[in-house]
From Swiss-Prot:
<dbReference type="InterPro" id="IPR000836">
    <property type="entry name" value="PRibTrfase_dom"/>
</dbReference>
<dbReference type="InterPro" id="IPR029057">
    <property type="entry name" value="PRTase-like"/>
</dbReference>
<feature type="binding site">
    <location>
        <begin position="89"/>
        <end position="90"/>
    </location>
    <ligand>
        <name>ATP</name>
    </ligand>
</feature>
<keyword id="KW-0067">ATP-binding</keyword>
<comment type="function">
    <text>Involved in the biosynthesis of the central metabolite phospho-alpha-D-ribosyl-1-pyrophosphate (PRPP) via the transfer of pyrophosphoryl group from ATP to 1-hydroxyl of ribose-5-phosphate (Rib-5-P).</text>
</comment>
<keyword id="KW-0808">Transferase</keyword>
<keyword id="KW-0418">Kinase</keyword>
<feature type="active site">
    <location>
        <position position="182"/>
    </location>
</feature>
<dbReference type="InterPro" id="IPR005946">
    <property type="entry name" value="Rib-P_diPkinase"/>
</dbReference>
<dbReference type="InterPro" id="IPR029099">
    <property type="entry name" value="Pribosyltran_N"/>
</dbReference>
<feature type="binding site">
    <location>
        <position position="159"/>
    </location>
    <ligand>
        <name>Mg(2+) 2</name>
    </ligand>
</feature>
<feature type="binding site">
    <location>
        <position position="120"/>
    </location>
    <ligand>
        <name>Mg(2+) 1</name>
    </ligand>
</feature>
<dbReference type="InterPro" id="IPR037514">
    <property type="entry name" value="Rib-P_diPkinase_arc"/>
</dbReference>
<keyword id="KW-0545">Nucleotide biosynthesis</keyword>
<protein>
    <recommendedName>
        <fullName>Ribose-phosphate pyrophosphokinase</fullName>
        <ecNumber>2.7.6.1</ecNumber>
    </recommendedName>
</protein>
<dbReference type="GO" id="GO:0004749">
    <property type="term" value="F:ribose phosphate diphosphokinase activity"/>
</dbReference>
<dbReference type="GO" id="GO:0006164">
    <property type="term" value="P:purine nucleotide biosynthetic process"/>
</dbReference>
Length: 283
């Protein structure tokens, strides 16, 4: 199995290759004077099984993925791992005339099989023109929290939609878990608090699949601290963290931010490489 890392996932590809006892394939990435992307696979892959690992947080990264798939023509098998898939949040029409961007992107990516990691909406997998599997990094996040030294942490989902992820993170560790609920007290007064459990005197870990602007999370952090939490930590799979999101969160009182390397950020403290490697070993 040859591992090829795209420009957005160089470290993750290297870690995955190491977990499989091999080295990543060498590639050249450059840009033409007009800004167009140039890439070349420098190693021989003819009749080999290859796996491309490339997140697509930007349009350019998506183009790079398409180019890498095309450059692998002649390989015996082409697997594609998209650790973080951009445009996945536009999985339905919110207004008449809109594009379902996740569907449009998925339809363009064809390979022997595709792997995603905690994709925002699982129904997107049905739009790929080939078999697609979603891997769950929840156990990795749970293991990290268990080894972090936090005493009796409480895991909290920011909304009902993230409850499934929080339950999976807590599984096998006995962590208490709950989700936040908004209660409108008046026309302009809304209180955010845990639905069932009291956060007073607890180390709280807010868990979600991704953190983007951090606005909602920052408000939740302030509320939890005001309600008596000792401290509030954030854990996510995908650290999108646009613009000044990290600064906004720390200003709100977050103790720390824990994320995986589906996107390579300063907050990427744990790697999904073992998860990818295990999936590839099963092929």
């Amino acid at each position: 199995m040859k591992i090829i890392g795209g420009p957005a996932s160089q470290l993750l590809a290297s870690r995955t290759a190491r977990a499989l006892g091999t080295e990543p394939v060498l590639c050249e990435f450059n840009r033409f004077p007009d800004g167009e992307l140039y890439l070349r696979i420098a190693d021989e892959i003819e009749n080999e099984k290859v796996t491309i690992i490339q997140s697509t947080p930007t349009d350019s990264d998506f183009v790079a993925l398409l180019q890498l798939i095309d450059a692998c023509e002649g390989a015996a098998e082409i697997n594609v791992v998209i650790p973080y898939m951009g445009y996945a949040r536009q999985d339905k029409k919110f207004k008449p005339g809109e594009s379902i961007s996740a569907r449009a992107i998925a339809r363009c990516i064809n390979a022997s099989r595709i792997f995603t990691i905690n994709i925002h909406e699982r129904s997107i997998l049905d739009h790929f023109p080939c078999p697609a599997v979603n891997l769950d990094a929840a156990s990795l996040v749970g293991e990290y929290i268990a080894g972090s030294g936090l005493e009796n942490p409480m895991l909290v989902a920011p909304d009902e939609g993230a409850q499934g992820l929080v339950k999976n993170v807590a599984a096998g560790h006995g962590f208490d878990h709950d989700h936040l609920q908004k209660t409108r007290l008046s026309g302009d007064t809304v209180v955010i608090k845990t639905k069932n459990l009291d956060v007073t005197g607890r180390h709280v870990v807010l868990v979600d699949d991704m953190i983007a602007t951090g606005g909602t999370m920052a408000e939740s952090v302030r509320m939890l601290k005001a309600q008596g939490a000792i401290d509030v930590h954030l854990a996510c799979v995908h650290p999108v963290l646009t613009r000044n999101a990290a600064l906004r969160l720390f200003n709100a009182g977050v103790k720390d931010i824990i994320a995986t390397d589906t996107l390579e950020k300063a907050e990427s403290l744990l790697s999904v490489a073992p998860l990818i490697a295990e999936a590839l070993k099963r092929l």
